[in-house]
């Protein structure tokens, strides 16, 4: 295939390297001839580096470079060109002008593809005399390493173009996902779940950026925390994408931006590229703050509470309701069980017992015990109020299994600092021969940090599936390949279970009153029907044909 790439910047040269290495003849052009020269030199250096590392033979390198043809004139006649990939700046008028000139220079058989990441494919195509010949082909940077491409048909795109582009992408060693022409397409849309919820947690002073990032990495298993990621991408870029997608989906609460970003962008706090973002960078930047050491009495007795969370409220029975918050003692017996936190309570008791902690049994804590409440979409404060627990020494624990050795302790405004330090020391205990746990301390919030981040990631992905913007399998494939998540968001929800995820979403919605946490129809139906979130389900069309 003969492919013309218009635009020799970072994306254009990456696409050129990818296509030429896969055996295609590539015409690389730009209105700036010096950019083409620099791009060819860059591709040559990348291919030679691959030879040095044993990833490519010298013969294959030479053949790929022979297939890379620099053009002085982007609008040159090209009767043999099969495909054009446009990779110029993100501006609708600029792209329309490029395709208008190409339409005059190239045969009608040539397929046009835009690498836009944020503009409507349909609006770009509308500038053409023949809008049916254009589709989106969205690569990610660096192209040779990011092995996922979004294929985006516009409203008028000919039906045979999408499978043809998909075949091209996959024959060149990348994976292709078909995505509807909607704001953010798939990967950028799905990625809003993590960063918008992280910003919401920061707005509420639940934890600082470093604390949220630690939990995202160690509990959820992400490679980077959301604030590290924003600093790497650039907050100016991230904030613009958040705003664009939110506006494009007509101010959908699930995608709501934060008030924190505009002033930081205006102040130049963009991240790595400016030397200062959520964190400081550069040779003179102060070292990152070290997590506070665990202190306190690790031998203090602990009482683990079973709380029911099926409907987002506690079902624990309280016999006697008087609570002495001054002395931190409770006269109420605590009992009860539930589907969400109860299993977490059992697991926590077993783990602490195995670590040698003094875990109390019975219906109520002793006057000296710290009280741990596994929360699932609810708050510690609600458990204190409904179960008559001692407010000064009752703390929340996230029952989500952690990817690494970290536990999370939630403290209320009524918590005693000494009791909190003791609770942290108890949670840090590990069985003989194992490393102690790191223990994050966060402000009491509905569901704690990791639950809210996970719920948002799953919810945004479920809303994409619900709108039929992409198939469940493509959603999970694109997110793992494009965002580096350890598992696709829908499969992640299935690991927890659709019913339990619905319980979490309902509890978050009921506790906060924030519509961003409302459950999707996709999640609700699958929980009710016993289907996994990754199941596309039966369509009406399937019931009328065959």
Question: Which residues make up each language-model segment?
Answer:
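Glycine-rich Rossmann-fold phosphate-binding loop(s) that bind the pyrophosphate
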Residues: 8-9
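N-terminal Rossmann-fold NAD(P) dinucleotide-binding loop
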Residues: 12-13
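Aromatic pocket-lining residues of Rossmann-like dinucleotide-binding sites
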Residues: 19
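NAD(P)-dependent Rossmann-like dehydrogenase/reductase catalytic/cofactor-binding core
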Residues: 22-24, 174-181, 209-445, 449-452, ...
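Conserved beta-strand positions in the Rossmann-like core of class I SAM-dependent methyltransferases
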Residues: 27
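Rossmann-like NAD(P)-binding element
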Residues: 31-35, 49-111, 119, 351-383
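Amphipathic alpha-helical segments at domain termini/boundaries
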Residues: 64-82, 164-173, 179-181, 427-436
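Rossmann-fold NAD(P)-binding glycine/threonine-rich loop
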Residues: 97-146, 153-166, 369-422
């Amino acid at each position: 295939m003969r492919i013309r790439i218009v635009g020799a910047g970072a994306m254009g040269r990456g696409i050129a390297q990818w296509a030429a290495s896969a055996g295609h003849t590539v015409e690389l052009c730009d209105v700036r001839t010096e950019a083409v020269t620099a791009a060819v030199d860059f591709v040559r250096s990348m291919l030679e580096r691959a030879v040095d590392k044993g990833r490519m033979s010298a013969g294959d390198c030479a053949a790929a470079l022979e297939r890379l043809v620099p053009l002085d004139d982007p609008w040159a006649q090209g009767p043999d060109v099969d495909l054009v990939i446009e990779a110029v700046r993100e501006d609708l008028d600029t792209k329309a002008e490029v395709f208008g000139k190409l339409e005059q220079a190239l045969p009608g058989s040539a397929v046009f593809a835009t690498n836009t990441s944020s503009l409507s494919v349909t609006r770009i195509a509308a500038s053409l005399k023949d809008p049916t010949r254009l589709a989106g082909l969205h690569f990610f940077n660096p192209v040779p390493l990011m092995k996922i491409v979004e294929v985006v048909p516009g409203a008028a795109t000919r039906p045979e173009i999408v499978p043809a582009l998909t075949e091209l992408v996959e024959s060149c060693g990348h994976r292709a996902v078909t995505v509807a022409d909607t704001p953010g397409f798939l990967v950028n849309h799905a990625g809003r779940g993590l960063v918008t919820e992280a910003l919401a947690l920061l707005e509420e002073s639940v934890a600082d950026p470093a604390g949220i990032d630690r939990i995202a990495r160690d509990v959820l298993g992400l490679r980077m925390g959301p604030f590290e990621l924003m600093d790497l991408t650039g907050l100016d870029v991230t904030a613009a994408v958040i705003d664009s997608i939110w506006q494009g989906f007509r101010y959908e609460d699930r995608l709501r931006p934060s008030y924190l970003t505009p002033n930081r962008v205006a102040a130049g706090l963009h991240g790595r590229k400016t030397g200062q973002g959520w964190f400081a960078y550069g040779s003179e930047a102060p070292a990152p703050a070290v997590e506070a050491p665990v202190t306190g009495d690790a031998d203090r007795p602990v009482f683990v509470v079973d709380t029911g969370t099926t409907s987002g409220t506690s079902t624990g029975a309280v016999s006697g309701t008087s609570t002495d918050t001054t002395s931190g003692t409770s006269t109420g017996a605590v009992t009860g069980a539930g589907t969400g936190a109860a299993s977490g309570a059992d697991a926590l008791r077993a783990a602490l017992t195995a670590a040698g902690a003094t875990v109390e049994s019975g219906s109520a804590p002793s006057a000296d015990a710290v009280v741990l409440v596994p929360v699932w979409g609810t708050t510690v404060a609600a458990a204190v109020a409904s179960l008559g627990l001692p407010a000064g020494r009752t703390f929340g624990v996230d029952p989500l299994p952690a990817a690494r050795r970290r536990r999370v302790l939630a403290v209320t405004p009524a918590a005693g600092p000494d009791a909190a330090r003791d609770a942290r020391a108890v949670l840090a205990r590990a069985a003989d021969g194992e490393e102690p746990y790191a223990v994050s301390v966060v402000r009491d919030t509905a569901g704690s940090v990791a639950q809210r981040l996970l719920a948002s990631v799953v919810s945004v992905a479920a809303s994409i599936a619900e709108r039929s913007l992409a198939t469940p399998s493509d959603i999970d494939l694109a997110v793992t390949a494009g965002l580096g998540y350890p598992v696709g968001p829908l499969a992640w929800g299935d690991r927890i279970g659709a019913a339990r995820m619905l319980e979490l979403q309902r509890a978050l919605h009921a506790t906060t009153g924030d519509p961003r946490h409302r459950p999707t129809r996709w999640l609700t139906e699958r929980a009710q029907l016993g289907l996994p979130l990754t199941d596309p389900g039966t369509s009406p069309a399937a019931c009328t044909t065959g």
